[in-house]
Amino acid sequence: MRLKSLILGAACMAALASPAFAQSLTAITGGRVLTGTSVIENGVVVIQNGRVVSVGTGAAPAGARIIDARGKVVSPGFVAVDSGLGGSEISSVGGSDDLSNGANSISASFDVSYGLDPWSFTLPVARLGGITRAIIVPSHAGGGGGGHAHDDSDFAGVGDGGLQSPGLFAGQAAIIHLATGTDILVKPRVAMVAPFGEAGAGIAGGARGAQFTQFKETLAEVRLYARNRAAYDRAGLRDLSLSRADLEALIPVANGSMPLIVTVRRAADIQQ
């Protein structure tokens, strides 16, 4: 019963992300409110213009839409990170998976936001669990495959088909909300994603050292391209290993304006 109350309370919070509530004044009253640092019995959570403006006790503001949460638990919405919600239905069915790309000329420039499905059956299921936002992370289409005990091929989306893309990068992540409606995208291209560890080593040729060398060389090429676009346009620049689309996508990473999400499993890889 307690689990049901928690789910119902979390679902209430998810509903508040809906555009219908975006410009309204709403109060959730009577519930057991978990703030993250304390527990408020018979609490009142006030939301105005889509944002929580107060959490406490007492009466709801005059004119507020009341959501009765008596007998329920109200908690902040959860954020799912490293998620495929809305981008993949069944991972084993290729036609339903828009999280990876095998084209040789598109790796860093791959943008998962174009493949998001607001009608995905995964969204309402996650919403019932209290998830209100998610970071949708692309998976790399290539990798070493492999079948030994420490294989990372299932991490960062590396498939069994072997190397499909020469790029070290899986693509660009996006943020979505899980409210009902057709526009679930909050922000596209929020971060670049790159698998490291054994998965990344397989992409680079089999060794971690090779991946780090290739990674540094790639960023050097991106900086060279960014300084010499005109020369690149007139074929006056040396051959570069990436397509123009990938070079453009990596400029924000090279200059520090876009975060880089690195996926690893081993402590030694994190320390690198």
Residue ranges of predicted features:
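Bacterial N-terminal signal peptides that target proteins for export
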Residues: 1-8
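Short, solvent-exposed loop/turn and secondary-structure capping segments
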Residues: 57, 78, 88-93, 145-154, ...
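Sec/Tat signal peptide C-region and signal peptidase I cleavage site
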Residues: 18-22
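Polyanionic/metal-chelating signatures
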Residues: 127-272
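Histidine-rich, glycine-flanked metal-binding segment
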Residues: 33, 37-75, 92
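Soluble non-cytosolic domains of exported or imported proteins
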Residues: 100, 104, 113-120, 206-209, ...
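Bacterial N-terminal signal peptides
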Residues: 9-17
